[in-house]
Amino acid sequence: MRIDQSVIDEIKNKTDILDLVSEYVKLEKRGRNYIGLCPFHDEKTPSFTVSEDKQICHCFGCKKGGNVFQFTQEIKDVSFVEAVKDLGERVNIQVDIGQNQTNSSTKIASDELKMIEMHELIKDYYHYALMKTVEGEEALNYLHERGFTDDLIKEREIGYAPDNSHFCHDFLEKKGYDIELAFEAGLLSRNEENFTYFDRFRNRIMFPLKNGQGRIVGYSGRTYTDQEPKYLNSPETPIFQKRRILYNLNKARKFIRKQDEIILLEGFMDVIKSDYAGLKQVVASMGTQLSQEHITFLQKLTQNVTLMFDGDYAGKEATLKTGQALLNQGLNVYVVQLPSGMDPDDYIRKYDNEQFLKFVQQDKQSFVLFKVKMYQNEINHNDLAYEKHFKETVRDLSLVNSGIIRNKLIQNIADIFKVNPETIQYELDATYQHQMSSNTYPTFQDEPSKQQLILGRLTKNEKAERALIKHLTKDKDTFLNYYQKIVPEDFTNSYLKRIFSYLYDYYSKNDYYTISDMMQYIESNELREVLIELDQYHLNDEPYENEIEDYIQIIKNNNNEDSLESLNYKLREASRIGDSELQKYYLQLIVNKNKNRM
């Protein structure tokens, strides 16, 4: 789908970022800018800044921000197209999809909207059947016995599908919906012999399943009798794919941002009861192992994931598998281990809400430590297992982002393996060296943008690269005068290299530079962060004679000895502050520099 650029520009020009952000954040004027508490993470000291002049916002804590479109995408967790439409409605501008959208794709979009409409219409019918009919009394009593109050049932829009094969079928038919489309939406089943349609869900308690925008896209029907299966979910449809659905994400999103943590539970019933008990940042996958799409959703919201699965064997195995997948993706992973045989509902019913919340807060441990404890018996009694788990643990420690947490883990894990902490640290350093020299650690190949904020000492070359890009963003004439004298490959900083490439594209379509407009050309959040940092980098308004030429010459010469000396200094500084990400990055650069000198 494509929206005409002139429409995008008109919407952006008519949307004042100060007015927009003020709907979500209480702002106070500080000098030329406005500042408030960040809406994307929990903080006590305001670090979220809005520039009315530049029409951008930026959080100096979590680094999120951008122009009006990027702010809307982040605050509402929607796509760029959806953000444009949303802001278009705000300023009374009609947003039409471009001509490249075919009639076929238009029909698909229309059908998907009708599928969602069907799900949301039948929801009210199901709810009425549960709360107001004799046939729904047994199901309602079952819910009451399980601790579901009428208020909770209403809040979660829970319903009942009667034991009638045409309850949903007849309702949708009377409303004028295509029965074939209702089948494709997963609300009906079909007899393949005579092609007759009947209700998929019968005699089940109905739990609506919503997408990230809060629209109902499927159902989970739970039996309250001996009927099998215990849970019957909607099939895979154009609007419902399990790999893309996290139950309760639409409701939990604001709490996840506030707490800077997401708690992943085993099932949606666990989520409902935990949320009702006061644990708000909870979600669950729909009976499937965590997909890459799920992990991507999580990474957009927070870097901290806590797993709280059932306290049985299957729950522990699922914790090991899921935790490893999350750790491998660079997330900070923690575990709350429920007592044997218990799920969250069991714990809440045995104790109370307050004790449950206290337990979750106090029993949290690093996934790496949980994993070692799970294999402690093998470690103590099997030499082969000891060596295998020792190597795995060292690798897992290399993935822990926080130096403080990693050092604490080393102390605890050393006791389990019955070695000195120095032994683990030695093996960990060797692992870093191997990963860097063999280029087997792709996660940290790009330069961490925060290195300029943490480590103040820049090399001569780094200063030149940053100053050059800053000058090239001042106006189009400056860019055109110098862009042919240097190529992206001359830059050592990967972010500045990419910004230089984007500037060429930007100036080919724009005569004047504004950071708000430039944001439209950049999809990477990290790159936007660097662009904002660069915007705050102060230079003289007018470069002195040959200043830009000097920067280009420095970049092309790239003094290796000066770079190596500075890199060693930065490696020591990164080690001192316990930042493993920076250690790995600078170690990689040192290895590469030494290779080039040989």
From Swiss-Prot:
Zinc finger boundaries on the chain: CHC2-type: 38-62
Disulfide feature: none
Alphabetical UniProt keywords: DNA replication, DNA-binding, DNA-directed RNA polymerase, Magnesium, Metal-binding, Nucleotidyltransferase, Primosome, Transcription, Transferase, Zinc, Zinc-finger
Signal peptide limits: none
Cross-referenced Pfam families: DnaB (PF00772), DnaG_cat_HB (PF21650), DNAG_N (PF08275), Toprim_2 (PF13155), Zn_ribbon_DnaG (PF01807)
EC number of this enzyme: 2.7.7.101
Residues noted as binding Mg(2+) 1 in the record, renumbered to the chain: 266, 310
Function: RNA polymerase that catalyzes the synthesis of short RNA molecules used as primers for DNA polymerase during DNA replication.
Subunit structure of this chain's protein: Monomer. Interacts with DnaB.
UniProt record similarity statement: Belongs to the DnaG primase family.
Free-text domain note: Contains an N-terminal zinc-binding domain, a central core domain that contains the primase activity, and a C-terminal DnaB-binding domain.
Protein name per UniProt: DNA primase
Organism: Staphylococcus epidermidis (strain ATCC 35984 / DSM 28319 / BCRC 17069 / CCUG 31568 / BM 3577 / RP62A)
Gene: dnaG
